[in-house]
């Protein structure tokens, strides 16, 4: 049964069908093999509706909407300016500023695609003019934008939290440590690259200029305070923090900065609605698929066949990491989370792994796979945004992928990288 379900999904994917079709088809075929007729198909529909019922999913469209508003407005530009003013003058400062700006914008958007557009579009021309090779610039933007998938408000963590019934607030806090570690590694590599390639430094900003850019960026810097401070302080749930971010973004861009009209807001809302519809269809289809394979005990069959339960916690984490990394090299990250999390859930529970640690590792692997050839989705986002050939986008990625894989291995052996802040925030 498992072979039939997954073979059907693979064939449909290879034929080019949208991601939701293989999920629904796999669930439907599994349903027919279980019950033998169509008399109880309403059960599968009920499972799809149940999958999109959790209130925490409301945070997804809200964070997407807030990110789109900031991308079209001035918030992203103000964050870029303040980072450039403080670190742009050091060796590799422009590249370090790009990585830092991606991290800062990721901390208010949770979207890798929005980060590529908002940060990559204005900074790539400046980096090329400064003497950086385009292959390095593209790889830096793609991989630094993936930090947005790890640090709060990560949309990937929201989906994982819903599918696995794990605290989204704890996942958000756990992603901060690995995200900052990645930023440090990318910054160190940017410095080494600039030294080896004799990239000239940018002019040092005056203290008056730094103060001016800081004042301009104070309003956009309120987003992380709302998200992290609000959740940590017990003021907001993640869903409430998302709603507060939307309201804050609208007030900033429409009333304070006056960078968007009501017509712009309407266009942004339409775009968000389209993306949200796709995400929710995927989540609903994934819920039906998860119910079918769980009912048929497919996860137990697969995991029993490879003997994963005898590997111990470290071995299980390595298998999970490899599965999600490879999966996201070929398939959309949300689909990989929806399909594989239910498969590994029984063994995660049986070996006593912390679901927050597992979620952090999974989210990191999803981010790495999304930026890895041959079909990582972030690669094609960069191709579409910057109009550059595939070979040029992927040429500079190996050093970044190796650093990200190094962080994932460190997380497995030193879980406190992720769990220290979680334990501190939630007194565990």
UniProtKB/Swiss-Prot annotation:
Q: How does it sit in the membrane?
A: Multi-pass membrane protein
**Where does it localize?**
Cell inner membrane
Q: Name one Pfam family in it.
A: DctM
Highest taxon of source: Bacteria
Which family does the entry's similarity section mention? Belongs to the TRAP transporter large permease family.
Record note on quaternary structure: The complex comprises the extracytoplasmic solute receptor protein UehA, and the two transmembrane proteins UehB and UehC.
Q: What else is known?
A: Transport is enhanced in cells that are grown in the presence of ectoine, but not by high-salinity media.
Q: What name is this protein filed under?
A: Ectoine/5-hydroxyectoine TRAP transporter large permease protein UehC
- Organism equals Ruegeria pomeroyi (strain ATCC 700808 / DSM 15171 / DSS-3) (Silicibacter pomeroyi)
Lineage of source species: Bacteria, Pseudomonadati, Pseudomonadota, Alphaproteobacteria, Rhodobacterales
């Amino acid at each position: 049964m498992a072979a039939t379900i997954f073979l059907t999904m693979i064939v449909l994917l290879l034929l080019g069908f949208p991601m939701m079709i293989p999920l629904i088809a796999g669930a439907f075929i599994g349903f027919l093999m279980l019950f033998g007729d169509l008399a109880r198909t309403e059960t599968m529909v009920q499972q799809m509706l149940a999958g999109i019922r959790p209130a925490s999913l409301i945070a997804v469209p809200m964070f997407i909407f807030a990110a789109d508003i900031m991308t079209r407005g001035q918030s992203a530009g103000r964050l870029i300016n303040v980072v450039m003013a403080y670190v742009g003058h050091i060796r590799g400062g422009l590249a370090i500023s790009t990585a830092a700006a991606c991290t800062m914008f990721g901390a208010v958007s949770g979207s890798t695609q929005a980060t590529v557009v908002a940060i990559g579009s204005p900074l790539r021309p400046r980096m090329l003019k400064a003497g950086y090779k385009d292959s390095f610039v593209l790889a830096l933007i793609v991989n630094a934008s993936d930090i947005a998938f790890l640090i709060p408000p990560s949309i990937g963590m929201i989906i994982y939290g819903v599918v696995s019934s794990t605290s989204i607030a704890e996942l958000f806090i756990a992603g901060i440590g690995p995200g900052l570690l990645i930023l440090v590694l990318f910054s160190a590599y940017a410095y080494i690259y600039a030294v080896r390639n004799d990239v000239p430094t940018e002019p040092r900003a005056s203290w008056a200029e730094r103060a001016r850019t800081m004042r301009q960026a104070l309003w956009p810097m309120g987003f992380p305070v709302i998200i992290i401070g609000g959740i940590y302080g017990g003021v907001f749930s993640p869903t409430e923090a998302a709603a507060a971010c939307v309201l804050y973004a609208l007030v900033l861009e429409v009333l304070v900065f006056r960078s968007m009209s009501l017509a712009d807001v309407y266009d942004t809302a339409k775009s968000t609605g389209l993306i949200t519809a796709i995400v929710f269809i995927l989540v609903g289809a994934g819920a039906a698929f998860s119910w079918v394979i769980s009912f048929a005990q497919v996860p137990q069959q697969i995991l029993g066949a490879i003997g994963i339960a005898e590997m111990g916690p470290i071995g299980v984490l390595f298998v999970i990491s490899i599965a999600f990394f490879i999966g996201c090299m070929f398939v959309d990250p949300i689909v990989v989370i929806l399909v594989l999390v239910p498969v590994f859930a029984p063994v995660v529970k049986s070996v006593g792994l912390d679901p927050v640690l597992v979620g952090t590792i999974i989210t990191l692997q999803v981010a790495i796979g999304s930026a890895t050839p041959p079909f990582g989705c972030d690669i094609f986002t960069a191709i579409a945004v910057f109009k550059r050939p595939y070979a040029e986008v992927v040429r500079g990625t190996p050093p970044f992928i190796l650093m990200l894989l190094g962080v994932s291995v460190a997380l497995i052996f030193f879980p406190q990288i992720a769990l220290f802040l979680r334990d501190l925030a939630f007194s565990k």
